[in-house]
Amino acid sequence: MSEKIYPVPTDIKKNALINEETYQKWYRESINDPEAFWAKHGQRIEWFKPYTKVKNTSFNGDVSIQWYEDGITNVAYNCIDRHLKNSGNHIALIWEGNNPYHDKKITYNELYEHVCRFANILKNHGVKKGDRVTIYLPMIPEAAYAMLACARIGAIHSVIFAGFSSEAIADRIVDCKSTFIITADQGLRGGKLIKLKNNIDHAIDIAARRGVHVNQVLVIRRTSGTIDWVKGRDFWYHEEISHAKTDCPAEMMNAEDPLFILYTSGSTGKPKGVLHTTAGYLVYVSMTHQYVFDYHPGEIYWCTADIGWISGHSYLIYGPLCNGATTLMFEGIPTFPDQGRFWEIVDKHKVNTLYTAPTAIRALMGAGNSFVEHSKRTSLRLLGTVGEPINPEAWKWFYHTVGDNRCPILDTWWQTETGGHMITPLPGATQLKAGSATHPFFGVQLQIIDGEGNVLEGEAEGNLCIIDSWPGQMRTLYNDHERFIETYFSTYKGKYFTGDGCKRDNDGYYWITGRIDDILNVSGHRLGTAEIESALVSHPAISEAAVVGYPHPIKGQGIYSFVTLMEGITPSEELYKDLIQHVKKEIGSIALLDKIQFTPQLPKTRSGKIMRRILRKIAENDFDNLGDISTLAEPQVVDDLIANRQNTEATA
């Protein structure tokens, strides 16, 4: 762990919304009297009917989480309408296309009109409050319009990352019984064309075989590429919008009405539908956006995340727009047309805050400094990281090379389930350590707990838990409250178990050490090992599969697969490549296998349980620390696995 302290820059401290003294005062208030603290900060959004109840939460028994439960509001109203009187002509959204020559700026007035038209299209097609709408779109302005249109009329959106396959889409459609889909003909991502409508057509067929029938598909024209068309089911957005009205009243939404479902990987292989509701989520993401990014009116803020992930929901769309900010949406990738794209965008749009993933930082760091040095980046004030812990080397490169030693780095730890930032520096309050997420946000009570359930004090390492609720917390797993309780509240009774390991140093700084369950964090995206194993075993040549993570210089964690073959099948380069393509087809390109090791047997206990601990060590090339292997049914299997390992680089 890095012990060098990076002080708060004087110019940041001078103008910051929160200094160290205010942080300490507010944090104490938020812990000592959360009811009063969140009653005050709940006023940051506008209410149609004010709340009288603030916090009604329990982590025990049936687990119930309610915030501002008798208040009535609307998320889209707060993100658009309330800004129109004073800021209607301010830029709400800057869109930077995949092509460097394509961009557009949308004011709050224009955003209002786009969202109302979109909402009226949904209503014209019978979509109503409580209906689930699947959104499978590239990073185009219509993706933001679609989300906000759902929020405006009270429909529950389920956004699916545009890299997911037909099978993964179908899983999500079936789970939430969505019958209305919004997609595009195709998507552009770097030099690749993504056949979105084609994927949706296949997903609809799969869902139908599983008993869920999609009735309507709204298609946005992005490339004008050739697509299949089902008359009576498929509708063109550009045709529908031409006769849609430009005004649509915001639905009266109870504070605890669902806002969206976002699916995240589960250790059983079945994706979990994380449910976020209306008011508490919006209070929390707008507050964290304002204070974590020290947002001042007029600044240009850029979160590089895709809308298919929680970062895109909370810190590209809802948090910034609720605060009346200018938020930048980028369709492309950081390395297209070359590795200077991020820095060109920063200069072109005079970006003040850049919030991106360690994966992107490592990839750009690997390209050398020349691309960075050819840009000015003088507009940058703050840098942020999200999605996974950032290693100190990448942190320092980001700080020194990109930020010219003057931009604080906001290393934020949080989850799809938490809704917003949980452990994070505040620019004007927090001295930094490279690789540490530093301190908890207001209202966040952390505990580090050992394997026996003992709470560890002072300098310690163990499992990270949160002992009380916060407004942005997920409320349940969609249609599976039992799994919600089992997943998050059964390991340590009365506490939210994050599934992450954590260290606290002697200065009280927190360091996230990574997942301690069977979830991989690949390029900041969570993938269940069970889901990948299921995909592998569905291949006719595969008898058994076990998947583990290993340190990857770019992606954080790589995907290492151990596979045993069916009788009569022999390993080959062709099969190796076929397995990679098969998993991509089953799950999506995000699940790109990095290493495949063919093995006659997997290490199993006498009861038949695969010893993943051993596989992890071998994948990490750390086989000197295998521990006790005497419980294996056939200990000699380990020697073969070590001899044929695919990763021969020692762990850091």
UniProtKB/Swiss-Prot annotation:
Which PROSITE patterns does this UniProt record tie to the protein? AMP_BINDING
Q: Which domain of life is it from?
A: Bacteria
Q: Which Gene Ontology MF annotations are present?
A: acetate-CoA ligase activity; AMP binding; ATP binding; metal ion binding
- Needed co-factor(s): Mg(2+)
User: Which organism does this sequence originate in?
Assistant: Bartonella quintana (strain Toulouse)
What protein does this entry describe? Acetyl-coenzyme A synthetase
Q: What is its EC number?
A: 6.2.1.1
In what way is this protein post-translationally modified?
Acetylated. Deacetylation by the SIR2-homolog deacetylase activates the enzyme.
Q: Which gene encodes it?
A: acsA
Annotated residues for binding of ATP: 387-389, 411-416, 500, 515, 526
Query: A Pfam family this protein belongs to?
Result: AMP-binding
Binding site residues for CoA = 189-192, 311, 523, 584
Q: What are the binding positions for Mg(2+) in this chain?
A: 537, 539, 542
Keyword Cell cycle among UniProt keywords: no
